[in-house]
């Protein structure tokens, strides 16, 4: 297996343009996310360089651009705040350790080939937690948007402090933030071809703050340390280890989802197919290295990836070029960033938060499915007010329960029992003949489709509806999968029939279905001679074994079908 991503020089010009353009987009976003996280602008910048470089080098999506993203920043903001509050001296170092641990989780997910399962999550849950993350990012920008420091306590703390924030608003900084949002929102599309709106807003906001409001006390980034970052060795504390592990697992899983969803977008634009497991390994390596050098964790960024592709990027070389361009800018122009107003960065992050919210699905979710909409709203509320683990866990659980209920209801209709020719079951002429000759004494019990645990009740109900018969033919020809619970229900039906002296025949038990019945020792109730591959033969032998019908008091040949 190739260790590195797909890199060649046949598309050098396109990759060069894509990488440079993606770097221009990344610069203001990295600054904004670094400040928003509480780790500082430097952490955001180095996260953009390091995650982007290693994810591009070792990942499985040639055109993916990786960097700190809105969802990852929201989680890291909470991690940094909680660890710094618990240990002011080592909290930030432990937060970077969490980023490294998150990367190790991602590498493990990739090596275990769990990539294909990461995005197998109901869209209502994905939409809900992404929208919740967007709302959190918007709320967390309210304080710097109003020209003040972010209060402690995250979302709840910000909402509680909102009256005080509004009463002490700094109009100039709020004006700069509003101007930033306005430029990003309303910049004409034809201008965006020449310069990304985030960079335009960053430059204009900084120039205006210096030229028009230079004599005012405006909060700015301040000095950014020049030179390469120092090595941040992992720091652990016994009393914080459990929290760090949980935070790392959440951050790692969120990064996996974020990256692979963006990889799907890249596939649709380039008509290629990414390697999800390889991508997770690349993302993990990037985050381990970023945490090791004091950078924020990152994931696949939709905006940067789309811009890269639209500018001509087609191989991982574009991601490597982007990282190198950012590195040169950081080393050569770090001092210029010191004058950037925090309100401008808050405006950029605010707009990112608004964009993360899944407005398209929010507007029509209730038209698609009321239950799905309720799940999405519940996940949003839990994400914003409780935490991401509870939101995703509860959302996935409820969504899966509802899905299983629907599947069980559909599969229950495939459990049928008849004692004469019936339109519900497609029978051949011979099968109809033998059922008619059975005169109600032979019952055909048919199961079809995957038999999951929700169908067990239908099997029991159908079996309980049987009144009188001398022989039962269990047709499993169309059962590709027999779950444990459904197997036990079938075993119970066969055992009860045998105890009542009824002849039992099994048709079409092959593969996984047969192995499951063998493990449950169901065939102890059924002689080997009563196991058939052909339903017609089973019905014929069942009727012949019973002999001629002798009494008018024997069971009626009318249908005893019950369908669920």
Curated annotation (Swiss-Prot):
Cell compartment(s), UniProt: Cell inner membrane
Span of domain STAS: 432-542
Effect of residue 471 to N: Alters bicarbonate transport
Gene Ontology molecular function, alphabetical: metal ion binding
Keyword hit for Ion transport: yes
Pfam family, any one: Sulfate_transp
Topology, Cytoplasmic side: 1-11, 59-70, 113-122, 186-196, 270-275, 313-315, 358-369, 406-564
Positions contributing to Na(+) binding: 258, 262, 300, 302
Domain of life: Bacteria
Signal peptide: none
Entry keywords, A to Z: Cell inner membrane, Cell membrane, Ion transport, Membrane, Metal-binding, Sodium, Sodium transport, Transmembrane, Transmembrane helix, Transport
Membrane topology: Multi-pass membrane protein
Transmembrane segments: 12-37, 41-58, 71-86, 91-112, 123-145, 171-185, 197-211, 241-269, 276-292, 303-312, 316-338, 342-357, 370-390, 393-405
Effect on the protein of changing residue 69 to A: Alters bicarbonate transport
CDD domains from the UniProt entry: STAS_SulP_like_sulfate_transporter
A Gene Ontology term for the protein's cellular component: plasma membrane
Consequence when changing residue 476 to S: Alters bicarbonate transport
Keyword Cell inner membrane appears in the UniProt entry: yes
Residues in the Periplasmic compartment per record: 38-40, 87-90, 146-170, 212-240, 293-302, 339-341, 391-392
Residues given in the record as hydrogencarbonate binding sites: 69, 301
Family matches, as PANTHER family: SULFATE TRANSPORTER
Entry's family note: Belongs to the SLC26A/SulP transporter (TC 2.A.53) family.
Functional description taken from the UniProt entry: Low affinity, high-flux Na(+)-dependent bicarbonate transporter. Involved in carbone dioxide-concentrating mechanisms (CCMs) that accumulate CO(2) and improve photosynthetic carbon fixation.
Subunit structure: Forms homodimers through the STAS cytoplasmic domain.
Protein name per Swiss-Prot or TrEMBL: Bicarbonate transporter BicA
Organism listed in the record: Synechocystis sp. (strain ATCC 27184 / PCC 6803 / Kazusa)
Lineage of origin: Bacteria, Bacillati, Cyanobacteriota, Cyanophyceae, Synechococcales
């Amino acid at each position: 297996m190739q260790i590195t991503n797909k890199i060649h020089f046949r598309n050098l010009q396109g990759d060069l343009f894509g990488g440079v353009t993606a770097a221009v987009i990344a610069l203001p976003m990295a600054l904004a996310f670094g400040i928003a996280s509480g780790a500082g602008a430097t952490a955001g910048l180095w996260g953009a360089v390091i995650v982007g470089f290693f994810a591009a080098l070792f990942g499985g999506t040639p055109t993916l651009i990786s960097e700190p993203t809105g969802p990852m920043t929201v989680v890291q903001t909470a991690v940094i705040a909680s660890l710094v509050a618990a240990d002011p001296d080592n909290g930030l170092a432990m937060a970077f350790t969490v980023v490294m641990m998150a990367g190790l989780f991602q590498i493990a997910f990739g090596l275990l080939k769990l990539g294909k399962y990461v995005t197998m999550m109901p869209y209502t849950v994905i939409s809900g937690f992404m929208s919740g993350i967007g709302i959190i990012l918007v709320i967390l920008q309210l304080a710097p948007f109003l020209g003040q420091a972010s209060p402690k306590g995250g979302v709840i703390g910000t909402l509680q402090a909102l009256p005080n924030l509004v009463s002490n608003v700094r109009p100039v900084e709020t004006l700069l933030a509003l101007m930033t949002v306005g430029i990003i929102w309303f910049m004409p599309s034809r201008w965006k071809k020449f310069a990304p709106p985030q960079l335009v807003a960053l430059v204009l906001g900084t120039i205006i703050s210096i030229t028009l409001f230079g004599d005012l006390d405006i909060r700015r980034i301040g000095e950014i340390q020049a030179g390469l970052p120092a090595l941040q060795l992992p720091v652990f504390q016994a009393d914080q280890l459990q929290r760090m592990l949980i935070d790392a697992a959440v951050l790692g899983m969120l990064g996996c989802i974020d990256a692979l969803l963006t990889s799907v977008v890249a596939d649709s634009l380039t008509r290629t197919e990414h390697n999800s497991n390889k991508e997770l390994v690349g993302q993990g390596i990037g985050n381990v290295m970023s945490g090791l050098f004091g950078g924020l964790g990152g994931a696949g960024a939709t905006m940067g990836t789309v811009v890269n592709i639209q500018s001509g990027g087609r191989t991982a070389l574009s991601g490597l070029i982007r990282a190198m361009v950012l590195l040169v800018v950081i080393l050569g122009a770090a001092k210029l960033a010191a004058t950037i107003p925090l309100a401008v960065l808050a405006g950029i992050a605010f707009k990112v938060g608004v964009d993360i919210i899944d407005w398209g699905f929010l507007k029509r979710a209730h038209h698609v499915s009321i239950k799905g909409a309720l799940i999405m709203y519940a996940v949003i509320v839990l994400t914003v007010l409780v935490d991401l683990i509870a939101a995703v866990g509860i959302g996935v659980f409820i969504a899966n329960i509802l899905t299983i209920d629907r599947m069980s209801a559909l599969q229950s209709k495939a459990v049928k029992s008849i004692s004469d020719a019936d339109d519900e079951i497609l029978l051949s002429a011979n099968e109809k003949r033998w059922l008619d000759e059975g005169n109600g004494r032979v019952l055909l019990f048919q199961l079809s489709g995957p038999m999951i645990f929700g169908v067990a009740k239908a099997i029991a109900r159908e079996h309980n509806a049987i009144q009188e018969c001398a022989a039962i033919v269990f047709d499993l020809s169309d059962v590709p999968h027999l779950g444990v619970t459904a197997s036990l229900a079938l075993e119970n039906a066969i055992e009860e029939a045998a105890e009542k002296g009824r002849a039992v025949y099994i048709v079409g038990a092959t593969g996984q279905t047969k192995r499951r019945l063998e493990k449950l020792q169901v065939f102890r109730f059924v002689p080997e001679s009563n196991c058939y591959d052909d339903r017609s033969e089973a019905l014929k032998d069942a009727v012949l074994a019973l002999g001629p019908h002798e009494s008018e008091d024997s069971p009626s040949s009318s249908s005893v079908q019950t369908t669920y």
